[in-house]
UniProtKB/Swiss-Prot annotation:
Annotated protein name in UniProt: Transmembrane protein 236
Record carries keyword Kinase: no
Membrane topology qualifier: Multi-pass membrane protein
Transmembrane segments: 9-29, 47-67, 86-106, 122-142, 257-277, 294-314
Amino acid sequence: MASGKIIKLVVFELLEFAAFSIPTLVIMEQFATANQRTKSERTHYWLIVSCSIAYVAVVSLLIWVPVKVVLYKKRHLYKKIIGWRPVLVMCVVLTTLPSFSFSIAVTEVQKNINGSANSLPESLPDLPVSLVLLSLIVVDIIEKLRQYPLRGSQKGYEDNDICITSLQQIKTVTEQVVQSDGNPASAQAAKPTAMSQPRNHVAVLAGPLEPSFQSRILRTMSQRDVRAELFLRSFLMWADTVEMLRVAGHQAVYKSAWLYPVYIFSFISLLRMVFTPKNPLLNSLGILMQDLPFVFLRLSLILALGTITPVLGLCKNVLVTISYIYFNYVTKLRPFSAFETSPF
C-alpha cells in the first residue's frame, strides 16, 4: 500500500500539471473558434487545436518534467534556490504569458471578422481568464502546502507570533526580577545607567485582549489552522489583479486600445508570484509591480472611460503606496524620526 507521502506527492504533481496545461488548451480552443468564423471549413480550427496540444506536450516533456525530476532527485540543488520558485516561473512564463497573448488575439480576430469593434459582444467570456488565474493560485497554494502535513493540526501565523511574544515578555520580566532580588546593589547601580540612556523607546500600548471561550461551541468556532489560512491569503493577495482583469472584459476596454495596458500591467503584477512568500523584497515589489502601476492605470481608466473600475480599488492602491513610502522611508528622516510619547 502506498504511503501518505507518495499519495500526497502524486496528487500535488497531477494538480500542478493540470494547472500548467489546461489554461493554454482552453485559450487556444477559444482562439481557434474565433478564427473559424472567418472560414467555412474546419481545417484551421483543428490545426490550431493540434498546435496547442503539441505545444503543451513539447513544453511538458522538454521543460516541465525535467525540471520536476531535477528538483525531486537533486535536493542539494533545490536548497541552493533562494528567494524564487522554479515551478511558478514555468507557469507564469509558459502558461500565463501565452494565454494572455492569445486572449488579446481573440479580440483582434473578432474585430477583423466584424469589420469594427461596435459589433462585438457586450462583454468577453470570463471563464478563460479566470481559469488562468485560478491555475496560478492553485499552484501557489500547492507549493506552500508542501511543507505542511495534510493530517493533524497546525497553529495559525498569529497564534505562533502571540506565543513567541508572550514567552519573550515573560523571560524579560523574570530576568529583571531575578537581577533585582539577587543583587540589590547592582540594581541600584543600574538605575543611573538606565536614566542616562536617551529615551528612544517607550512602552508599546497593548491592544485589546483576545477573548478565551469556555463554551465548547465557541471554542470549536475559534479554531484556526495555518493550512486553511493559506487558501484565504492566496486568494486575497491576488484579488486586486483579478479585479483588474475583470475590467478587461468591459466593452469600453476590450473594444479600445485600453485592453493592452490592462493585460500588460496585470501580467507584471503576476510576476510577483515567482518569489517565495517570505522574500524580503516581496513588499517593495508589490508596490513597484502592482499598486503604483495600478494607481496610474485606474486613474487613467476613470478619467477616460468613467468608473468602470471601482474607486475603492484606486483608493486601496493609493493608500498602500503612500503608507509604504511613509513608514519605510519618510519616518527615517530627522523631522519624522522622533518617537511618540503619547499612547493615543
